[in-house]
Amino acid sequence: MTQNTPFPIFPHRHLLGIKGLTLQDLTTLLDRADANVTLYQKNDKKKSILHGRTQINLFFESSTRTQSSFELAGKRLGADVMNMIISNSSVKKGETLIDTATTLNAMNPDILVIRHNCAGAASLLAQKIDCCVINAGDGAHEHPTQALLDALTIRRTKGRIEGLTVAICGDILHSRVARSNIISLNTLGARVRVVAPSTLLPTGIEDMGVEVFHTMQEGLKGADVVMMLRLQLERMTGAFIPSIREYFYHFGLHKENLIYAKNDCIIMHPGPINRGVEIASDIADGTRSMIHTQVEMGIAVRMAIMEALLDPRHDYNGEKK
């Protein structure tokens, strides 16, 4: 895609999940994001494409990393960015999500970014508000922007995604990141594995097109990418693991089991990392770790999504301007 060639139109008003996106949809967003990385690596970080537009970040779950990334992405595009502080809002006083949506709609925003602890919250909001909605994570359902930044990290680091073996390891059961990544990586042509104890795997996970392994030794064999997930203890209501120490020994990533992956494999983690729980410090800080690269790619991806949703060629009435 050259600088003077327009990107294909992204044919969706909202980004509510990876499910339902085509290979062309994903490629369009990744190509846009790749162009953004190239620009700001040349210190050309600011654009004015969203000048005069309003972006509202509505986070019902705390996430310094994701919220800061969306805020910086909006500002780099020239948008006016407002962060809603939920602890000080009417929601804490009993206002429903629909009431909040109605109130925000009256402010005439152009983009609303929502993170919520309930699956489907972003979809509900999209039905009640006139602007574009971006899902920044809804319960254990989906986290589409994380999957896109992970795909961009892999593509820029390895040169491709198609044909690579990606091992996603850890708490698959409670992870929206795992769900979105499985869908996106399968669509992009990767071979996806999940590695976890049976207690941390959802029923029917095989139906998502993944190979299932219950030991790191088997699951990491020949892996090009190893993606670790944290234990989401806040979503657990029972005894899913015997102990943290035993979990780390069997399912954490450390030098004793990393030897089974390819020598040039890359290590990824959506953050925040729990050192000594799902990953050893020397691995997280090692030369194969892409954790900080993922953060960098996140800004470029979120810029690309907002650019695509507010592309002036859209009219959202089935025609293109």
UniProtKB/Swiss-Prot annotation:
One of its GO terms (molecular function) is amino acid binding. It comes from Bartonella bacilliformis (strain ATCC 35685 / KC583 / Herrer 020/F12,63). PANTHER family: ASPARTATE CARBAMOYLTRANSFERASE (PTHR45753:SF6), ORNITHINE CARBAMOYLTRANSFERASE, MITOCHONDRIAL (PTHR45753). This is Aspartate carbamoyltransferase catalytic subunit. GO terms for cellular component: cytosol. It catalyses: carbamoyl phosphate + L-aspartate = N-carbamoyl-L-aspartate + phosphate + H(+). Its EC number is 2.1.3.2. GO terms for biological process: 'de novo' pyrimidine nucleobase biosynthetic process; 'de novo' UMP biosynthetic process; amino acid metabolic process. SUPFAM superfamilies: Aspartate/ornithine carbamoyltransferase. InterPro entries: Asp/Orn_carbamoyltranf_P-bd (IPR006132), Asp/Orn_carbamoylTrfase (IPR006130), Asp/Orn_carbamoylTrfase_sf (IPR036901), Asp_carbamoyltransf (IPR002082), Asp_carbamoyltransf_Asp/Orn-bd (IPR006131). Disulfide bonds: none annotated. L-aspartate binds at residues 93, 176, 230. Heterododecamer (2C3:3R2) of six catalytic PyrB chains organized as two trimers (C3), and six regulatory PyrI chains organized as three dimers (R2).
